[in-house]
């Protein structure tokens, strides 16, 4: 059940630089933990002693041990990318005894109806001001003309922070 303390928003974001910490705070993170300079597991559990509700993961093969350590009982580990490593090993007893849930999300296999509904909801949230975009909101936008598509791909491959957008109109 939702208790007053569970209703309070308390985002913890792991980052690799002070610049990314600034962007995460602009996007709404209340806490940032630099995983290159700090013991991320220790710092996250100091902020959320019972663990976090959800881990949003982009490198499951590397991070599964810490994900398991910092996710609360009945929590979720949501995976939407694979930045290295094709296999994840799950300690079965430790995982199922805490009723953890792994949720894999791949946009391309959701089905067009769900993609359309999500796009409609996101556009409505942006139009209403409920979802902010741009550097001041922690998500720098990098625009490229359609004829500069190769440069846009290169920006993504080089790890551009934020969103790389190709203008087609």
Question: What residue spans do the PLM features occupy?
Answer:
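Terminal peptide-recognition signature
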Residues: 24, 55, 67, 102, ...
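Active-site PLP-lysine loop of aminotransferase-like
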Residues: 106-109
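Glycine-centered, small-residue-biased loops immediately flanking beta-strands
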Residues: 75, 100
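Adenosine-nucleotide cofactor-binding segment
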Residues: 3-63
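Acidic carboxylate diad motif detector
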Residues: 80-81
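C-terminal hydrophobic helical "lid"/dimerization subdomain
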Residues: 73, 114-169
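Conserved helix-to-beta-strand junction in the class I
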Residues: 69-71
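Rossmann-fold NAD(P)-binding glycine/threonine-rich loop
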Residues: 85-98
